[in-house]
């Protein structure tokens, strides 16, 4: 019989971090949630597509809410109690994601910033859709 190659799973080390930053990237197609410590080191992340939402369902506000709840439950295991929020992008899940961070028990929101990049007349935008 041939030998099996067994790959050892990486063990998640529990960190004790009191404050974190929630980055919400809401695009037209998906919503990405990343939680970091104050230095910018990633603690955990979650996406709407990674939770099983496929196609146009990824861009819904409900999918964004589920992604936030998933990421915050992982972050609570590391001891995160206070967060700041940085929001980027024009997606539909943006407002819902902010509200669901504030509604989560055991997590206090300290501040909210919009870090969406705005061009000073940069690249030409894509042409209008004709449906």
UniProtKB/Swiss-Prot annotation:
Keywords: Ribonucleoprotein, Ribosomal protein, RNA-binding, rRNA-binding. One of its GO terms (cellular component) is ribosome. GO terms for biological process: translation. Transmembrane segments: none annotated. Gene3D superfamilies: Ribosomal protein S11 (3.30.420.80). GO terms for molecular function: rRNA binding; structural constituent of ribosome. InterPro entries: Ribosomal_uS11 (IPR001971), Ribosomal_uS11_bac-type (IPR019981), Ribosomal_uS11_CS (IPR018102), Ribosomal_uS11_sf (IPR036967). Pfam families: Ribosomal_S11 (PF00411). PANTHER family: 40S RIBOSOMAL PROTEIN S14/30S RIBOSOMAL PROTEIN S11 (PTHR11759). Belongs to the universal ribosomal protein uS11 family. Part of the 30S ribosomal subunit. Interacts with proteins S7 and S18. Binds to IF-3. Located on the platform of the 30S subunit, it bridges several disparate RNA helices of the 16S rRNA. Forms part of the Shine-Dalgarno cleft in the 70S ribosome. This is Small ribosomal subunit protein uS11. It comes from Helicobacter pylori (strain P12).
């Amino acid at each position: 019989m041939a030998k099996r190659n067994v790959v050892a799973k990486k063990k998640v080390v529990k960190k004790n971090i009191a404050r974190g930053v929630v980055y919400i990237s809401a695009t037209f197609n998906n919503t990405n949630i990343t939680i970091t410590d104050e230095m910018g080191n990633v603690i955990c992340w979650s996406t709407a597509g990674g939770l099983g939402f496929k196609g146009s369902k990824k861009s819904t506000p409900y999918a964004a809410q589920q992604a936030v709840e998933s990421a915050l439950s992982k972050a609570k295991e590391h001891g995160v109690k206070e967060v700041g929020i940085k929001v980027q992008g024009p997606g539909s899940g943006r407002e819902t994601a902010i509200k669901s961070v504030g509604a989560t028990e055991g997590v206090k929101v300290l501040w909210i910033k919009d870090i969406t990049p705005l061009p000073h007349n940069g690249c030409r935008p894509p042409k209008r859709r004709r449906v």
